[in-house]
Amino acid sequence: MSIYDDILKQFPTIDEWSDSDQKIMLEPYTYLGINTAKELPSMVTKALNHWYQVPQPALDIVLQIVGPIHAACLLIDDIQDDSDLRGGNPVAHKVYGVAQTINTATYVCFDAYHKISELRPFLKSPETIDLWSIINDEIAALHRGQWIDLYWRDSLICPTEEEYLRMIHNKTGAIFRLPMRLLQALSPVDSVPDCFPLVNIVGILVQIRNDLLSLSADFTKDKGFCEDFSEGKFSFPIIHSVKADSSNSLLMDILRLRPKDEATKMKALRYMKDQTKSLDHTFDVLCKLEKTAKQELEKLGGNSELSSIFERIHLSPTPEIEDH
């Protein structure tokens, strides 16, 4: 008998999905080799639970939501930035192709979405708390931030520092606000603290820290040498340098070229370091952000886990530039 003779019985509902199919489909995701539990969003989430006291089973589900979404964002970011390396290895889309990597990243996000329903039994008032609106709000914010970042890059429009901070508030802040808001909704504590200001400043701090690190020698082995220039990206220190001397078009000209050679990128980096002092400015801003974050932490009564995280991400004075 041909399969077509009994086609309706062959496919009565949604097709079954085997474990082997799932494993193959997730390969670009698993290739990242990211231990999501050791990534900053997950670490901050666990530290925030010091105040929210969400039961461990519910906390685990929240981590299973934020971890994969963060990893999926990295997969998409690498494609949109046309990156070559992540963690010192070729990026996933250079191994599996752009199409497969996009499909896997999207699937991982939807898989995380499904876990929202598993949190409903932990809600005190499931009829009044909409967990779906929380995840929808923050995923939308993330995409809005990513859009404006790409728009500036592709249109060669240098934003102001204030505009950049607002972009970070959406793009990076969403990854930290999402789990915090879920914990807030799930908390059995009668009076939970307002962690929004702290989490928002953490998102800004983390992004600007990454912007500065991406111009350091230590970052070269993970992502390549000064890849922000090759990507034409307006990072925080680059924005400061462009705005510091509008009469000098050197940096804008280099960003327009999106150079791959180290000599051109080193020329841009030395201009930022020696002429506009943009690396020093970025470090000074980081110090102010750290101070604000620690003050906010004190207002909330302190948190040893978050204090440890702040110590871990603290940067020493501006890293030295090494010749290449």
From Swiss-Prot:
SUPFAM superfamilies: Terpenoid synthases (SSF48576). Mg(2+) 1 binds at D77, D81. Mg(2+) 2 binds at D77, D81. GO terms for biological process: isoprenoid biosynthetic process. Its cofactor is Mg(2+). Terpene synthase that shows monoterpene synthase activity and produces (E)-beta-ocimene as a major product and linalool as a minor product, using geranyl diphosphate (GPP) as substrate. Also shows sesquiterpene synthase activity as it is able to convert farnesyl diphosphate (FPP) into (E,E)-alpha-farnesene. Finally, TPS1 can convert geranylgeranyl diphosphate into (E,E,E)-alpha-springene. This is IDS-like terpene synthase 1.
